[in-house]
Amino acid sequence: MESCNVELIFDHIGHFGRFQIVLYLICAYQSLSCGIHYLSSVFLSIIPEHACKPPGMVRKAVFHNVSAWRLEDILALRSPEHKDHIMVELQDGEIWELTRCSRTWRENTSHLGYEYSGYKHDSPCFDGYVYDQSKWRNSAVRNFNLVCDQKWYARMIQPLIIFGVMLGSITFSYLSDRFGRRMALWCTSIGVFFFGIASLFIFDYLSFMITRFFLVMASSGYFVVVFVYVMEIIGKKARTWASIHLNTFFAIGAMLVALASYLLKTWWLYQIILCIVTTPFILCCWMLPETPFWLLSEGRYKEAQGTVDTMAVWNKSSSCDLVELLSLDVTRSHNKSPHSIRKHRLADLFHNLDVAKMTLIVWLDWFTANLGYYMFGKEVIRRKENEPLYLLLVGAMEIPAYICLCIWLKRVGRRKTMLLFLLVSSLTCMLHVVMPSDYKTAKRMVALLVKSVISSVFAFIYLYTAELYPTTVRCLAVGSSNMVSHVSSIFIPFTSHFSKVWIFLPQILFGILAILSGLLSLKLPETQDTPMKSTWETTEQQVPENKDSLGEGPPDSFERWDSSRALSFAERWGLSRASPDAEKWGSGRVPPDAGKWGAGIAPPVTERGASGRASLEDESGGSGRAPPEKNTEMENEIENMKVSNLGGF
């Protein structure tokens, strides 16, 4: 099936009519929900300031020169850099020294101060812990006491979420290519709804981890599939900005997380509000039809015709007959077995050397973008006292970045955009390195700028990847790239260890990687203003002067015979049929030797055995009819056809 013919559907029914607008808003709303569930884990795994709980009611608490009647008030003033213990006097007169993970009883009850040389007795935190409640009145860490010797359980939350994102990306992208976009969207939407509600009714650490894992797995799978879905349901004229601005809704979701975390200090109430926001989508996800691209790639023409007719009715436009519009493709698809039509394997992304190179470059771009996204995102929000504020700024800065990206993409091609944005991110990263460490606010603003540029790369690379690959593996290509990109998230916690070698080593490595990725992106095909492809066959049959999507033209030894020339020759000389290779080689191609010998000139006749085959007359015993005696022009053209046929076999 010719992808350009599929694109012609939107010329009939509209590129972004009422039907597509409704579907887009439904998909965008759920993208907002994915942003909420993605980033809510940022605050779920925060370890608040804490201290070992004393075995009684506190009468007075002292921390250096500060005293208070409540231990929680002292904890609100203490930062992670403070290592000294807190002195407390209980109602019964006992004095205890409290650290984060231990407590010490003093024998002398008359001295409440740091200078003490009497008898002490250490004991574990049998009574639990006291937490700072200025930010959160309760949280996952507090509910499950994930501190001290249980602290590694809290640190497992983020790696598990990353693994869920990776698994969701590759799993649901495969299911999308195999069973359809709509089926994958239904499964992920139900998963987001079900596990979002289930996360409200958990009372132990294991249940918490299971629900969060499947929740982010479904959210990740949804965002990958919905991006491809939007690109295939919207016409070429509105496809770029519509797909890019799905990330805008994702950023709005991140801003809502920051706002909710600032206003709601109770963890369970915070979760309820976020789940309520994401619930309405489940009521309307059944409206999503399958995309014409996927249906046609699977040979399901009746269903595709029904979808196109429905879209035409909603858009108040004229429909089109797919059998007439895609008649050549319908005939071709009948000659294919179901096995040849349905190939949805990760190995298809490496089915030849050129495709393998393209896939590896795309994966490197994804890896670099994700590395910078989380590295500088961590740099921006690392200040413990203002996490919601900086997360809000991160989301707010991404929105104008996406708008600028859409404007830029209208004027510059995909490859140049990728190169430019990666180079800008590398240069701003170097600016962040050379700035004095005393300018903390300025450095944080530069990190915010780098984060915004990398966010644009991240939004754009979804679009570019979907345009590079055909429908049969499009979602798998985006999903596998997203999975590879999150491999970089595994290295983010180790950047602090790299900083011990040299404080700027992580930023330097990212800057070098960004330059390398940008330069290699020039090797990728240009997809601006080109129709999306439907199969690998259409990917490899692009015109030679523009080169196909794999970066090369068709092989010289297998050039196609122009069927229109063959038919005109048959009509001119009254032959019963055209060249036997006319249908085989397709239209729009020239004979192998046409460029070499020129039009209307016959090449030298190949002698018997020179090519490993006898001439056509030797094998068949002649043409079976005598040529016109006085028509040399006809003889030359017949001889041209014979010699050309030898090259075809």
Curated annotation (Swiss-Prot):
MF terms (GO), sorted A to Z: amine transmembrane transporter activity; carnitine transmembrane transporter activity; organic cation transmembrane transporter activity; spermidine transmembrane transporter activity
Protein localization: Cell membrane
Listed GO CC annotations: plasma membrane
Superkingdom of origin: Eukaryota
Biased composition (Polar residues): 530-544
Reactions this protein catalyses: (R)-carnitine(in) = (R)-carnitine(out); spermidine(in) = spermidine(out)
Membrane topology, as annotated: Multi-pass membrane protein
Family the entry assigns: Belongs to the major facilitator (TC 2.A.1) superfamily. Organic cation transporter (TC 2.A.1.19) family.
Biological function: Facilitative organic cation transporter that mediates the transport of carnitine as well as the polyamine spermidine. Mediates the partially Na(+)-dependent bidirectional transport of carnitine. May mediate L-carnitine secretion from testis epididymal epithelium into the lumen which is involved in the maturation of spermatozoa.
The protein, known as: Solute carrier family 22 member 16
Source species: Mus musculus
Gene: Slc22a16
